[in-house]
Amino acid sequence: MRHVSEQQLKDIVAKYVLGEKIATTSLTITRDNALGLVDTIGKIFMIDGDFVDDMPELDGEFLSYGKTIEEYFIDLIPPMDKPDLDSEKYAEALKYYAPANMPTSYSTTLKPKVLATSVPFNDINRAVHNEDQLVNAVTKITKKLSDSETSMIWNIKFQLLGEACKKCIDAMSTTTTFAVATAYALGTYLKDSDSNARGIIVKDYKANNATSWADAVTKGYIQVLDLVTTIAKPVDTETGEAFIIQLKKDVKKAKRISSGYSLNGNNIGATSTMKLYILEDLTAYLDVKVEAGAFHQDKVLAPVGVKEVRDFGDADAKIFAILVDTRGVKLHRTYIATYDNTNGLLGFINYFRHCEYTAFLSRNTFMKVYKEA
């Protein structure tokens, strides 16, 4: 009886399974058969995956007519005292009380994109064994139109979140210092020279309407903004717990009436459509290192969805998360069509997937960016 040791078997297999015979990009034709015919390919196939956009919550409705999005916002009304019957303030009954409108904003088309592929005639059939393989190969070619668009949409959403981050950071980085003797238009971002705080003009400010930054805030001309928190990336227990504490504070604010957490600084009503987008490599640290369990809804104290993202497009690499009201971040498809044409002379058919989108960011919904120093 012959015996083979484990090591002997490993050595035999190592000499048998040769790398040059596996996953190579070239093939040497062989005729190892009695008739001297070319040895046939035994299996022809393609391993394909599912290209899925895992952020459907950022899909806006299809815009069939018109591609520009116009957003307006009417802010809260200040209460006033009711005059007495004998106060002679009769004119106030017929006075025009203009709505407290915030600046209107626009999101325009990102312009059309085209995805193109070709299927040659009298070509693939030369290589396959049967009709099923031919149909499968052609289907795979045309399927890539849809797969490629899905991948593009997915990446556009990363970039759209990144653009939201950029706008928040830009607002909190303004270098325009508030001067009491200068008039400012609605929507102007300003900086306080003393506290280094940032704010936005939410009521038309005329020269000397206030005596200081604090006075302008008190009188309702300036809304202080809190759009960015600079905090250590959560990679261990200490930094993870610090981030979760800050997140809980911000989620609480989002679930109540708040102001200063949008690009317009307007008053925001409570919302249940909040979601935290965080870099995918950080959730493992938070789940393992932090006992509080950052992403358990009962631990966050208020329901908030969590979505892992690969990145935030080309935004600052120090950004690792953003908390947003998903109603204010949408990608709208405005056109989709697939056309084809045939080249009869050369013998192939072209397929073209036409698509167009409008990316929308609200200036009036909750946003909070988290970044490293």
Please place each PLM-identified region on the residue numbering.
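Extended, compositionally biased alpha-helical segments that mediate assembly or anchoring
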Residues: M1-V38, Y285-A373
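Alpha-helix boundary/N-cap detector
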Residues: V4, T25-D32, G36, D132, ...
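Assembly/oligomerization interface modules of large self-assembling protein complexes
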Residues: L35-T117
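Intrinsically disordered or highly flexible coil/loop and linker segments, enriched in small
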Residues: D50-F51, D147-W154, F158, G260, ...
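Long, contiguous amphipathic alpha-helices that act as assembly "spine/axial" helices in icosahedral shell
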Residues: M102-S173, I349-Y351
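Flexible metal-binding regulatory segments at protein termini and peripheral loops
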Residues: R126-N130, A207, R363
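Tryptophan-rich substrate-binding surfaces of secreted polymer-degrading and adhesive proteins
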Residues: T174-D226
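Extended oligomerization regions of viral-like shell subunits
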Residues: A185, S193-D194, A214-T338
